[in-house]
C-alpha cells in the first residue's frame, strides 16, 4: 500500500459542499416555477362546456331571458362569468337560444321593449332591431343576426354551450 492517499483539501471540500447546497437551492426555487408554467398544459380539462340553464317546462313560445354563469379559465385564473340567453320555442316546437349581445357594438338587446316595433328584439343603444328568430332588420345598425347558443336537452333540463355566429345577413 502506498502512503499516497488521495486526500480532499479543505478548499475542495467547501467547493463541493457549496456546489451541492447551491444546486439543491436552485432546484427548490425552479420546481415551483416550472410547475406553475406547465400546470395548465398538463391539467385535464372539463369534459363538457354545457351549463344547465332552465327546465324545458319553463320554455314557451314567448322569448324569456335566462341568466347563468359559465366557468372561464384564462391561463391560470379561473372565474365565473355571467351570461344570459333569450330562449323560446318556435312554431315547430324546436328550442331556439339566442345571445343577447347586439352585433352592432355589443350592447344588450331586449325582447318587445320598443313600442314602435312590437315582437322584435330591440337594442336601445343605437335603435337596432332583430326579428324573433334573431335576424337583423335591414336598415338598422346591426350587420349580422344574433348568435345562437349550442344546446342540448337532457333529463328535462336545457343545457347551453357556446354562442355561435350565424354569418352576415
UniProtKB/Swiss-Prot annotation:
> Domain Rieske spans what residues?
62-160
**Which annotated residues bind [2Fe-2S] cluster?**
102, 104, 123, 126
Q: Which Pfam families match?
A: Rieske
Q: Does the keyword Metal-binding apply?
A: yes
- What does the note under cofactor report? Binds 1 [2Fe-2S] cluster per subunit.
Cite the entry's keywords alphabetically. 2Fe-2S, Disulfide bond, Electron transport, Iron, Iron-sulfur, Metal-binding, Oxidoreductase, Transport
Q: What S-S linkages are listed for this chain?
A: 107-125
Q: Which cofactor does it need?
A: [2Fe-2S] cluster
Molecular function per GO:
2 iron, 2 sulfur cluster binding; metal ion binding; monooxygenase activity; oxidoreductase activity, acting on paired donors, with incorporation or reduction of molecular oxygen
User: What PROSITE patterns does this protein's entry cite?
Assistant: RIESKE (PS51296), TAT (PS51318)
InterPro entries under this entry? Rieske_2Fe-2S, Rieske_2Fe-2S_sf, Rieske_Fe-S_prot, TAT_signal
The source's domain of life comes to Bacteria
SUPFAM superfamilies in alphabetical order: ISP domain
- Its function? Component of the menaquinol:cytochrome c reductase complex. The Rieske protein is a high potential 2Fe-2S protein.
* PANTHER family noted in UniProt: CYTOCHROME B-C1 COMPLEX SUBUNIT RIESKE, MITOCHONDRIAL (PTHR10134)
On assembly, the entry states: The main subunits of the menaquinol:cytochrome c complex are a Rieske-type iron-sulfur protein (QcrA), a cytochrome b (QcrB) and a cytochrome c (QcrC).
Give the similarity note: Belongs to the Rieske iron-sulfur protein family.
- Descriptive protein name: Menaquinol:cytochrome c reductase iron-sulfur subunit
Source organism of this protein record: Geobacillus thermodenitrificans
Amino acid at each position: 500500500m502506498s502512503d499516497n492517499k488521495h486526500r480532499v483539501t479543505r478548499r475542495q471540500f467547501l467547493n463541493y459542499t457549496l456546489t451541492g447546497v447551491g444546486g439543491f437551492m436552485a432546484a427548490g426555487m425552479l420546481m415551483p416555477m416550472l410547475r406553475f408554467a406547465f400546470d395548465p398544459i398538463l391539467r385535464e380539462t372539463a369534459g363538457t362546456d354545457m351549463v344547465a340553464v332552465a327546465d324545458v317546462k319553463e320554455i314557451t313560445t314567448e322569448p324569456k331571458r335566462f341568466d347563468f354563469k359559465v366557468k372561464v379559465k384564462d391561463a391560470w385564473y379561473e372565474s365565473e362569468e355571467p351570461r344570459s340567453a333569450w330562449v323560446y320555442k318556435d312554431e315547430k316546437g324546436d328550442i331556439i337560444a339566442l345571445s343577447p349581445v347586439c352585433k352592432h357594438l355589443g350592447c344588450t338587446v331586449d325582447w318587445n321593449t320598443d313600442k314602435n316595433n312590437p315582437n322584435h328584439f330591440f337594442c336601445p343603444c343605437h335603435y337596432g332591431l332583430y326579428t324573433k328568430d334573431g335576424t337583423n332588420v335591414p336598415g338598422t345598425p346591426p350587420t349580422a343576426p344574433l348568435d345562437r347558443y349550442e344546446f342540448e336537452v337532457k333529463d328535462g333540463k336545457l343545457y347551453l354551450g357556446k354562442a355561435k355566429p350565424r354569418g352576415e345577413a
